[in-house]
Each structure stands twice: as structure tokens, then as C-alpha cells.
């Protein structure tokens, strides 16, 4: 079992990563992974892809066929195109409804596993000290702030520790990002070659 110190830290790392990568990016990736599973939704998505290809192919054929010179052929292709387009729109509407439902489920699960867990930990362990401070090292008012709101005096509360973790993670990420940006911006300085003398 992870200690409370590390649990809070890893929850804040997860929250930071989700906020940095982007919730919509993660939702899109999870949707693609969900479509790879053998479900009715994945079959619907495969059918949608097939119909989309067929609509594009029929549209090309229709554009390549002259409506004046070969009207019968063009009209036949047009009817097939319209029928396929209608099927495609129907499946697309169904798939969009399923994606919306999936997105809501993922958002709820993501919130419960990150921010919901953070709030629960802060409520459940509000009177529990995360760790104790050495006695007489800090003045009374500093101990009071560090134990705010309900932890015993002379200890660090989970709320304070949670804020420290969030701040430390974001500052560390900024430092690492700045270091990578600085390394990436360094370009090789060309060394002047000696002039070749012509003989």
C-alpha cells in the first residue's frame, strides 16, 4: 500500500499529465482503442468506413460520367450514390450518438479517478497528518498554516501537501520543458573552413 505522501503525489502527476496531454486527445485515443474491440460499435464503425469509401467511389464515377451523353448510366450511378449516402448518414448518426455516450462515460471515469479521488482523499484524511514536523523548528503561526484546516498542530495537512505537490509538479515540468527547448534551440555553429588556394 502506498503511503499517503506518494498517493497524493501520483494523483497530482496523473492530473498534470491529463491536463498537459489534453482530455480530448485522450478521449479520442480511447475511442479508437474501443473501436478495435470486438463490439457492435466497432462493426458499425467498419460499416461506416466501407460506406464512406463507396460514396466517394460512386461520386467519382458520377463525375467521370457525362450526364448528357450517358444519362441512363449517370442516373443509375446517381441513384446508387443517393441510396448509399442515405445509409452512410444513418450509420454516422448512430455512431455519433454512441461516441457521445462513450465520451461522457470516459469523462466521468476520468474525473472520478483524478479530481474525485483527490477530493475524497482530502476529505477522508483531513484530520490525518501526512507527516510530522520536527518540534520547535517552526514558529507557531507556520505550524498552524501547515496543519490547516484540521490536521494536528505540528504536522502537515493533506490539503497543504496536495498544494505543494501540484505546485512542485508544475514547476518541475516548466524547468524540464525549458531545458528541452533550450537544447533544441541550440544549433551547430558552422566553423569557417580555410580558403582553398588555387594553384
Swiss-Prot record:
GO terms for biological process: tail-anchored membrane protein insertion into ER membrane. It comes from the Eukaryota. Residues 1-4, 132-155 are lumenal. Residues 42-99 form a coiled coil. The keyword Coiled coil applies. GO terms for molecular function: protein-membrane adaptor activity. It is a multi-pass membrane protein. Gene3D superfamilies: Helix hairpin bin. Residues 25-110, 173-199 are cytoplasmic. Keywords: Coiled coil, Endoplasmic reticulum, Membrane, Transmembrane, Transmembrane helix, Transport. InterPro entries: Get1, Get1_fungi, Helix_hairpin_bin_sf. It is found in: Endoplasmic reticulum membrane. The keyword Amino-acid biosynthesis does not apply. Belongs to the WRB/GET1 family. Required for the post-translational delivery of tail-anchored (TA) proteins to the endoplasmic reticulum. Acts as a membrane receptor for soluble get3, which recognizes and selectively binds the transmembrane domain of TA proteins in the cytosol. PANTHER family: GUIDED ENTRY OF TAIL-ANCHORED PROTEINS FACTOR 1, TAIL-ANCHORED PROTEIN INSERTION RECEPTOR WRB. This is Protein get1. It comes from Aspergillus terreus (strain NIH 2624 / FGSC A1156). The gene is get1.
Amino acid at each position: 500500500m502506498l503511503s499517503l505522501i506518494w498517493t497524493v503525489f501520483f494523483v497530482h502527476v496523473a492530473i498534470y499529465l491529463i491536463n498537459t496531454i489534453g482530455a480530448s486527445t485522450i478521449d479520442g485515443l480511447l475511442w479508437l482503442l474501443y473501436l478495435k474491440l470486438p463490439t457492435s460499435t466497432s462493426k458499425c464503425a467498419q460499416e461506416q468506413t466501407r460506406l464512406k469509401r463507396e460514396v466517394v467511389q460512386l461520386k467519382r464515377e458520377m463525375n467521370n460520367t457525362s450526364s448528357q451523353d450517358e444519362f441512363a448510366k449517370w442516373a443509375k450511378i446517381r441513384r446508387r450514390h443517393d441510396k448509399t449516402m442515405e445509409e452512410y448518414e444513418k450509420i454516422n448518426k448512430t455512431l455519433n450518438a454512441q461516441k457521445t455516450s462513450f465520451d461522457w462515460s470516459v469523462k466521468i471515469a476520468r474525473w472520478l479517478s483524478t479530481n474525485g479521488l483527490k477530493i475524497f482523499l482530502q476529505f477522508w484524511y483531513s484530520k490525518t497528518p501526512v507527516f510530522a514536523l520536527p518540534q520547535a523548528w517552526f514558529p507557531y503561526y507556520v505550524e498552524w498554516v501547515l496543519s490547516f484546516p484540521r490536521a494536528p498542530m505540528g504536522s502537515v495537512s493533506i490539503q497543504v501537501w496536495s498544494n505543494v505537490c501540484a505546485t512542485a509538479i508544475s514547476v518541475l515540468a516548466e524547468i524540464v520543458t525549458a531545458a528541452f527547448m533550450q537544447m533544441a534551440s541550440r544549433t551547430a555553429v558552422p566553423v569557417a573552413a580555410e580558403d582553398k588556394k588555387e594553384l
